[in-house]
Amino acid sequence: MKIKMKVLQVIPRLGYGGAETGCYDLAHFLAEENCKSFIVTSGGELLKYIKKKSVKVFRLPVHSKNPVLIFFNSLIISLIIILYNINIVHARSRAPAWSCLIATKLTMRKFVTTFHGTYNFNNKFKKFYNSVMVRSHLVIAGSNFIFSHIKSYYGNFFIDGRRKLLVIFRGINTNYFHSNRIPISKIDNFSNKYNIDRNKFIILMPGRLTNWKGQKLFIESLKLVLIHENSNMQPFQAIILGDEQGRSVYKKQLIDLVQQCRLGKFVKFINRCDEMPIAYSISNLVCSCSIEPETFGRVAVEAQSMEVPIIASDIGGSTETIIKDKTGFLFKRGDVNNLANTILMVMQKDYNSLKSIGLEGRKNVLKKFDVNKMCSTTFAEYKKLIELS
């Protein structure tokens, strides 16, 4: 008798990040495959887009690292598993993963984790806390970079063969991130709202405001670009787009740095954009300047899907998602001069060259990083787990 798949995904918040959109996309994909799809989360902006007839959502404080709440959550998740006869529980962050580990042990169900980051650890306790992400039956790495990280630091968990580790590249919705599907009216409204001069060369740096994303490096590179640009080049307008997420001190540092570099007329801050394809569509160039490795590098993939040239640090997932000098460019991590020179090089390219890079970028994403490929591969692995039950 064929078992109907019922999958419960657990994530701290269902916001606009890579892990969150992956959870959202997979939940609806499973529903379309005639599976029962459930999500446990504490809240988040994407909740309003959930199709309630397809995906059932439970609100729990799974964002909390409090041991008492982690245990409380494990009991409630156990009840959900039993009441809805869940086959597979898929955790996407450490605190909820501990709750899921306890719940799946109690109910004897299959446990899956997606390893979304390198998770810094300074002591044995922190490494133990992080290790929950490799205590599942199936561990999914979002890139070869993360796969290597897991093997290096947690390889002993896979020696006995009881756990499976594999790479499933994250995917994006290429129909959503499509340059031909954005109404001109939305582009005009966005440009007018933020006073963006589209006659200038628009350089976009998306990402939440945090030091490791490299906003300071980006600003310092623009100072050099301004010094070295020539009269034949189009004047530029840079946009730093990202939520400060409570880091008001860091944002003030960025604003002060812009003034120190005399870039007040050239750099604009935008807190957020609920429709990122609009922001990409007005841009001539996208920069991802992380000084620490990205697990996957979602910005690089979204930019390519939107046919916009991308410049990214030569570390982490971006080295796998960008075909160097064909779909985008890589600069030496933390090297302000190398970044500035790369920006200048792109700014000096003609329209046809930039268009060609954009077209190659979209081909690359359609081939390797489409959301349906990510979801179908994950679904196939789920089925294998159930067949082993």
Task: Give short role names for the model-derived ranges.
Residues G246-K251, L263-C273, A279, F329-L330:
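Active-site donor-binding acidic/aromatic loop of nucleotide-activated sugar
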Residues I39-E45, I172, P206, Q237-K252:
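Glycosyltransferase donor-sugar binding loop
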Residues E20-D25, F201, M205-I227, K252, ...:
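A conserved mid-protein helix/loop that constitutes part of the nucleotide-sugar donor-binding site
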Residues K324-D325, F329-V336, M345-Y351:
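Conserved acidic donor-binding segment of nucleotide-sugar-dependent glycosyltransferases
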Residues N192, M345, S353-K368, M374-A380, ...:
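A short, well-ordered alpha-helix in the C-terminal region of glycosyltransferases
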Residues A91-A97, F115:
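Short His-centered aromatic/hydrophobic patch
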Residues I39, P309-A312, I322:
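Short hydrophobic beta-strand element within catalytic cores of glycosyltransferases
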Residues S136-V167, I172-S179:
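A short, active-site helix/loop in glycosyltransferases that binds the activated sugar's phosphate group
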